[in-house]
Amino acid sequence: MSKAAIQFFRGVNEPVVPDIRLTRSRDGRTGQATFRFEQPAAIAPETMGDITGMWMVDEEGEMVTREVNGKFVNGTASALEAVYSWKSEQDFERFMRFAQRYADANGLGYSQSQDSDQTEGADNQQA
């Protein structure tokens, strides 16, 4: 079983663990996960190459988003923000399986927002 990982460059795992926030439509069919990486290795000065996407890789395969933006402070890259969107319950369930594997691989926990409408049902998903 391969370890779940996030990559900005194919084959290179990002060591910085992001803050991840989920939002879902009321019917649960659509939604998005916003990933925020503070000082990720992918934007270190010694890293050469353009970031063209964020890959979420695990034993089932990979998911990708091309919606990746840099955040700058005083002209210096300080963070990356990526948004992964889903359009069906199956896509959401697949994302949650990845998220559980990624959390397990990185010793992370899950906490539900005070605004339960945004993450309703997310904590009931089984890996």
Swiss-Prot record:
One of its GO terms (biological process) is photosynthesis. It is a peripheral membrane protein. It is found in: Cellular thylakoid membrane. Keywords: Membrane, Photosynthesis, Photosystem II, Thylakoid. Residues 109-127 have a biased composition (Polar residues). It holds the Pfam family Psb28. Residues 108-127 are annotated as: Disordered. Its main location: membrane. One of its GO terms (cellular component) is photosystem II oxygen evolving complex. Belongs to the Psb28 family. PANTHER family: PHOTOSYSTEM II REACTION CENTER PSB28 PROTEIN, CHLOROPLASTIC (PTHR34963:SF2), PTHR34963. Part of the photosystem II complex. This is Photosystem II reaction center Psb28 protein.
